[in-house]
Amino acid sequence: MAPPPAKMQEIHQFLSSALTQRGPSALPYAENTKSLIRQHLLNLISSYTSLDPKTATFTHNDGRSVILLQADGTIPMPFQGVSYNIPVVIWLLESYPQYPPCVYVNPTRDMIIKRPHSNVSPSGLVSLPYLQNWIYPSSNLVDLASHLSAAFSRDPPLYSQRRPPPQPSPSIGSGYSRPLPPRQTDDAAEVYKKNAINRIVEMVHGDIVLMRSAREVETEGLLSLQSDLKRREEEINNGFKEMVIEKETLEQQLQVIAMNTDVLGSWIRENQGKAKDLLVDLDVDDSFECIDSLSKQMLECTALDLAIEDVVYSMDKSFRDGSLPFDQYLRNVRLLSREQFFHRATAEKVREIQMDAQVASIAARLHS
């Protein structure tokens, strides 16, 4: 049943006034969404007359307080053929309607939240698939209230405390207490206090979980940094050790070079005068003396072979440059090649004789 026209007029005026306020008292909703928020609340009140729009202070888990719109009242809950009313508060958060509202079951002083419950936490916070799968702009408060009623019908979230004698009446949540075993009646103020404490404990627990997650991330970052620093420390230490070893090696090599320099300098000073006397009568051919005639013949053949090789190379270059006629080039190459062959053959025979003599000498030493 729709609310009376007078009440709807009051609700229209209230929402228009609340959503058009400016300055510090303005509600924290985006300007382009205020008309949709107003329409959602009007549709909700028209479908569920037991709900009323209000403004109240909402405290976030981080301690921030902000004035928000809410729908406060009851949601019908059909259960075992009887309709009961479940008190709820639907908070329209700052991000509404892009994001879902926050719904709390708000038990009266003679009610207790069922624990455990599939959709309601001990603090009264409601969790539904419809809220988790909220889709803007198709999701709305009327459908949310319908899903709340259906979920509560499957599993009533509240039960009333028993007071002898039992009074069966369709009061809020009274029908749900019948299938439960008799239990001791708690003081209503104590129950309200317990529910408030449970809500605070849940908020603190949520803050602790967030802080713990942040600390874990920070700790992982510090451990990773510590590992990198240790690795760099090892690399620096290894590099320093290598530099020390290299320095010691260079110092040793420097000492050897200094000693060799001193020896070479002493030898030069001692033989500098002798070299001047030797240069007067020095014969290049007598600079190297062979130990025997075979070695001398080998040296001569090798020298002549290499000399002929140089001559042929020079002739080849002259022929390519055009300074040597072709017939003369062929004739000289033929003569030099024949002579070079003779010297190479002689050197090969001398090498064989030397090898035989060396083998005989080694055999004689082995038998002696």
Swiss-Prot record:
<keyword id="KW-0653">Protein transport</keyword>
<dbReference type="InterPro" id="IPR037202">
    <property type="entry name" value="ESCRT_assembly_dom"/>
</dbReference>
<protein>
    <recommendedName>
        <fullName>Protein ELC-like</fullName>
    </recommendedName>
</protein>
<feature type="coiled-coil region">
    <location>
        <begin position="234"/>
        <end position="255"/>
    </location>
</feature>
<comment type="similarity">
    <text>Belongs to the ubiquitin-conjugating enzyme family. UEV subfamily.</text>
</comment>
<keyword id="KW-0967">Endosome</keyword>
<keyword id="KW-0813">Transport</keyword>
<comment type="function">
    <text>Component of the ESCRT-I complex (endosomal sorting complex required for transport I), a regulator of vesicular trafficking process. Required for the sorting of endocytic ubiquitinated cargos into multivesicular bodies (MVBs).</text>
</comment>
<dbReference type="InterPro" id="IPR008883">
    <property type="entry name" value="UEV_N"/>
</dbReference>
<dbReference type="InterPro" id="IPR016135">
    <property type="entry name" value="UBQ-conjugating_enzyme/RWD"/>
</dbReference>
<dbReference type="GO" id="GO:0000813">
    <property type="term" value="C:ESCRT I complex"/>
</dbReference>
<dbReference type="InterPro" id="IPR017916">
    <property type="entry name" value="SB_dom"/>
</dbReference>
<dbReference type="Pfam" id="PF05743">
    <property type="entry name" value="UEV"/>
</dbReference>
<dbReference type="GO" id="GO:0036211">
    <property type="term" value="P:protein modification process"/>
</dbReference>
<comment type="subunit">
    <text>Component of the endosomal sorting required for transport complex I (ESCRT-I), composed of ELC, VPS28 and VPS37. Interacts with FREE1. Interacts with TOL9/TOM1D.</text>
</comment>
<dbReference type="GO" id="GO:0015031">
    <property type="term" value="P:protein transport"/>
</dbReference>
<dbReference type="InterPro" id="IPR052070">
    <property type="entry name" value="ESCRT-I_UEV_domain"/>
</dbReference>
<feature type="domain" description="SB">
    <location>
        <begin position="292"/>
        <end position="360"/>
    </location>
</feature>
<keyword id="KW-0175">Coiled coil</keyword>
<feature type="region of interest" description="Disordered">
    <location>
        <begin position="155"/>
        <end position="184"/>
    </location>
</feature>
<feature type="domain" description="UEV">
    <location>
        <begin position="18"/>
        <end position="162"/>
    </location>
</feature>
<dbReference type="Pfam" id="PF09454">
    <property type="entry name" value="Vps23_core"/>
</dbReference>
